[in-house]
Amino acid sequence: MNNYRKDLSSIVSLVNQGSRVLDVGCGDGELLEYLKKDKEVIGQGLEIRQDRVNKCVAKGLSVIQGDAAKDLSLYPNKSFDCVILSQTIQATGKPKEVLSELIRIGRETIVSLPNFGFWEVRLNLFLTGKMPITKRLNENWYETQNIHLCTIADFVNLCDELKINIKKTITFNSKKIKTFKEKPRAIENVIAEEAVFLLTS
Amino acid sequence: MRTDQNKILCSYYNDPNPLVLESGQKINEHQIAYETYGKLDKNKSNTILICHALSGDQFVASKHPITGKGGWWNRMVGPEKPINTDRYFVVCANVLGGCMGSTGPSSINPENGKTFSLDFPVITIADIVNAQLRLIEHLGIDRILAVIGGSMGGMQVLEWAASYPKKLVSAIPVATSSRHTAQNIAFHELGRQAIMADPDWKGGNYSETGVSPTKGLSIARMTAHVTYLSEASLTKKFGRKLQDKKDLGFGFDADFQIESYLRHQGLTFVDRFDANSYLYITRAMDYFDLEITHKKNLTEIFKGTRNRFLVVSFTGDWLYPTSENLMIVRALSAAGADVSFVDIDSDKGHDAFLLEEPQFDKTLDGFLSSVYSSLG
């Protein structure tokens, strides 16, 4: 199982059966399909790219073509049981504003992100003196969509600043998956490649 | 059965029951002219109702009896097309108030044997939909798989979903609005004033003289036609090109291709459209405001709906812009409805929904197929 699949299955494990879910940046609708099948959710997606929206619509998913940076205002407060932002927060222009919007819209929010504090990333930067290129972060700095990369510690700090409650954290690398009640241990900022957070206001 | 009434060969339904209008007035009996394509399946579950726009009619995918041209949505409706007539039973009816066989101001008033003209009651989008519902029931259809329409057709779609959600599985409003804006009303008023300023209009009673206000109607059409295009599409198609000449004529003939094109649009329109129908139908659109008709806000109107929605807008449409369509999406989302939305990238203006837009075809095909297969 590759890390991407681990990321999806961790998210699925945090979603309650039959809940109303919004997947922000839903892509081809892979996660929504997975959630519909496994958790019988009532799912909705938000996706900016036309071809991806079409794929979702053809699969019978309900998806709105829009931009997470401005179209989240479409949704009233607490209009979803769960709002998911999977591997996208680091690619948004204003992560802080987006996170606040997600918390406003969802009773619960799930955010997954690549950990820039992972030891391989650190080592890569230390040894080469250049922006790290790893399996997970595989594009040059001038090409990558990831304009706001952060570490697990950075994200936890942002949640503290916004008074967002971390209910659960799942961290993983190619070898292990770990689940923490509330925040992860400090060492995870070094040994985890990715993290999934379950948040509430 | 298709019959030939007033040289319009299509199917007709004579509704013997009075139709009470939104205004409180009543039409005692009326006729609806319609076309169908494909076959109704055993469970009567494969119907797609297409609602036409202001200048459209029931000939969505068949040869027009007056112009001889192909159907206005030929590219979308037919075997192997997104609205696949091998799979779906397609119904398209001329709207109440229209002039292609359905009862309207050019029809004969059975009470006095004269043409209705302005004695025809003012109708609304809700009245048009109520007449369609009667037709659908007459055809023995309990539930429509999808109701789809662009522009004024989209208003009918919204009205169907607001008034008769249990009669539908899905609704596809395209390039439309939940209420006519001041700009929309303004352009319609230009058209109406052009018709009424034509001396041949005769206070609406031109049927007595046998000369219809073609000048006024063609100007109305020319004005409206510009609103269906975009600066980009006009520039691409015409630019400042001259019509059949090398130099400016220093006069007021059609020097530019765009002028000649518009004049042609106006002239051909009057052959197939009735001036009074144009007044009545534009009025119905102007009066359209779902919140006023239903005395609730948009979100409340759709609260609890089980219908699936696909809302479609086009980036280059300035008449029914993306923002207007997004208002519908916003309300449906807030109401907890199952809604998809696409904003098709196009520079063709409002008419884009009638033109070649492959992404629109793909979206529609995907949505309809998934709704169809969800019925098992």
Predicted regions and their residues:
Chain A
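Class I SAM-dependent methyltransferase "Motif I" SAM/SAH-binding loop
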Residues: 25-27
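A short acidic, Gly/Pro-enriched loop at the edge of an enzyme's catalytic core
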Residues: 73-82
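Conserved alpha-helix/loop element of class I SAM-dependent methyltransferases that forms part
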Residues: 2-18
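Alpha-helix C-terminal capping/helix-to-coil transition sites in glycosyltransferase folds
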Residues: 17, 78-79, 105
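Class I SAM-dependent methyltransferase SAM/SAH-binding core
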Residues: 30, 34-71
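S-adenosyl-L-methionine-dependent methyltransferase catalytic module, highlighting the catalytic core
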Residues: 97-101, 108-201
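A short SAM/SAH-binding and catalytic strip from SAM-dependent methyltransferases
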Residues: 82-94
